[in-house]
């Protein structure tokens, strides 16, 4: 008789995805982030569901409902901070996951990669709308500034912004629809994750060498399940330290002041994980130009398969390209720092230089370096 996990229609799918899945024998800890992101998404949906039970999406009561969750609900403070810091954790893992994909050339799986970029957009949209819900000062002004960017779109811009707001400013209608979208998007993300995995399992995983590993595969369980559990424990350790010791470390103090349309905070800035894109947006003096640069700073990821000029897939044996990638990482850290600084000298100049080098490294220097390395292979 066949094993139930191989014959049952539902269990069979799980078996092919997580148990008997043939996996390269040499994948490193950098391949842990996918499963960690899955756990993170699950945690966010669960904590979000419990928060939604007590939250009210109304401008008059939103702020006080969040206060009520933290003060009066059993372990409400923990659920709230787990959700807020879980989002930060999500983005940390997401950026590591994308970085791994760039380093090891995983972007050559075109469908998987492009769905991943769409997933990044969806997660960013969800996080942005979630940040608006507590209805603090930074929630309100962040929503005002970011939605206002759409007014830069020629002809339809201003109408589009008013349509999104549901009025002539960010108000009750905006908060209600943002809550609705914030609730539904994680489920759309979950569906997209399944498609992401479907396409990944069509080709099989990449590995650090970038070579075909069909001749050397091992079952996913128990080898990688146990390896993923180690990663999970480390992630939970970091997350719990954040939640229990310094829950407000990554937040903005301004968001503890209720939203006031008559009082603008001195520095309007998004959450830390959007600061690099915010710095790119601010580095261009023209509104439409800034919006295009902001969109392209993420969309540029879709160009990686096209810009790949190297004869080797992975960067494991390409020290010059490695060097460039680490310069890009340093550049992104500088952009993140600049995004949180006021718009004044010298930060404006640093931001403009960092934004320019971000696009130069990806569009010009990396393909050129790969081309040069191909030449060195012939020596």
Swiss-Prot record:
It is found in: Mitochondrion inner membrane. The chain crosses the membrane at residues 33-53, 77-98, 113-133, 178-198, 226-246, 288-308, 320-340, 347-367. GO terms for molecular function: metal ion binding; ubiquinol-cytochrome-c reductase activity. It is a multi-pass membrane protein. InterPro entries: Cyt_b/b6_C (IPR005798), Cyt_b/b6_C_sf (IPR036150), Cyt_b/b6_N (IPR005797), Cytb/b6-like_sf (IPR027387), Cytochrome_b (IPR030689), Cytochrome_b_C_euk/bac (IPR048260), Cytochrome_b_N_euk/bac (IPR048259), Di-haem_cyt_TM (IPR016174). Binds 2 heme b groups non-covalently. Keywords: Electron transport, Heme, Iron, Membrane, Metal-binding, Mitochondrion, Mitochondrion inner membrane, Respiratory chain, Transmembrane, Transmembrane helix, Transport, Ubiquinone. It comes from the Eukaryota. Its main location: mitochondrion. Heme b b566 binds at residues 97, 196. Coiled coil: none annotated. SUPFAM superfamilies: a domain/subunit of cytochrome bc1 complex (Ubiquinol-cytochrome c reductase) (SSF81648), Transmembrane di-heme cytochromes (SSF81342). Pfam families: Cytochrom_B_C (PF00032), Cytochrome_B (PF00033). One of its GO terms (biological process) is mitochondrial electron transport, ubiquinol to cytochrome c. GO terms for cellular component: mitochondrial inner membrane; respiratory chain complex III. Heme b b562 binds at residues 83, 182. The keyword Transport applies. CDD domains: cytochrome_b_C, Cytochrome_b_N. Its cofactor is heme b. The keyword Transmembrane applies. The cytochrome bc1 complex contains 11 subunits: 3 respiratory subunits (MT-CYB, CYC1 and UQCRFS1), 2 core proteins (UQCRC1 and UQCRC2) and 6 low-molecular weight proteins (UQCRH/QCR6, UQCRB/QCR7, UQCRQ/QCR8, UQCR10/QCR9, UQCR11/QCR10 and a cleavage product of UQCRFS1). This cytochrome bc1 complex then forms a dimer. Belongs to the cytochrome b family. Heme 1 (or BL or b562) is low-potential and absorbs at about 562 nm, and heme 2 (or BH or b566) is high-potential and absorbs at about 566 nm. Component of the ubiquinol-cytochrome c reductase complex (complex III or cytochrome b-c1 complex) that is part of the mitochondrial respiratory chain. The b-c1 complex mediates electron transfer from ubiquinol to cytochrome c. Contributes to the generation of a proton gradient across the mitochondrial membrane that is then used for ATP synthesis. This is Cytochrome b. It comes from Trinomys albispinus. The lineage of its organism: Eukaryota, Metazoa, Chordata, Craniata, Vertebrata. The gene is MT-CYB.
């Amino acid at each position: 008789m066949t094993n139930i996990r191989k014959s049952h229609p539902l269990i069979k799918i799980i078996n092919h995805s997580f148990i008997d899945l043939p996996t390269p024998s040499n994948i490193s800890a950098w391949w842990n982030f996918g499963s960690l992101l899955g756990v993170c998404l699950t945690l966010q949906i669960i904590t979000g569901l419990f928060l939604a039970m007590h939250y009210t999406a109304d401008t008059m009561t939103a702020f006080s409902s969040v206060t009520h969750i933290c003060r009066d609900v059993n372990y409400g403070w923990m659920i709230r901070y787990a959700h807020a810091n879980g989002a930060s954790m999500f983005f940390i893992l997401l950026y590591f996951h994308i970085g791994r994909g760039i380093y090891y050339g995983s972007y050559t799986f075109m469908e998987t990669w492009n769905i991943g970029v769409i997933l990044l957009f969806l997660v960013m949209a969800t996080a942005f709308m979630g940040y608006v819900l507590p209805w603090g000062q930074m929630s309100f002004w962040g929503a005002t500034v970011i939605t206002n960017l759409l007014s830069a779109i020629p002809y339809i811009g201003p109408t589009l912004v008013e349509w999104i707001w549901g009025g002539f400013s960010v108000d009750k209608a905006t908060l209600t629809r943002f809550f609705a979208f914030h609730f539904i998007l994680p489920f759309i993300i979950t569906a997209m994750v399944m498609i992401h995995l479907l396409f990944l399992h069509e080709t099989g995983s990449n590995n650090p060498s970038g070579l075909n590993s069909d001749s050397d595969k091992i079952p996913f369980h128990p080898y990688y399940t146990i390896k993923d559990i180690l990663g999970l424990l480390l992630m939970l350790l970091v997350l719990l330290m954040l939640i229990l010791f310094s829950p407000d470390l990554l937040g903005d103090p301004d968001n503890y002041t209720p939203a006031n349309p008559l009082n603008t905070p001195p520095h309007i800035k998004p959450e830390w994980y959007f600061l690099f894109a915010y710095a790119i947006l601010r580095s261009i003096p023209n509104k439409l130009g800034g919006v295009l640069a902001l969109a392209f700073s993420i969309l540029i990821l879709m160009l990686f398969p096209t810009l790949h000029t190297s004869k080797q897939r992975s960067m494991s044996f390409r020290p010059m390209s490695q060097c460039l990638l680490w310069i890009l990482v340093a550049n992104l850290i500088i952009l993140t720092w600049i995004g949180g600084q006021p718009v004044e000298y010298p930060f404006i100049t640093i931001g403009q230089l960092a934004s320019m080098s971000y696009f130069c490294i990806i569009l010009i220097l990396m393909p050129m370096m790969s081309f040069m390395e191909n030449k060195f292979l012939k020596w």
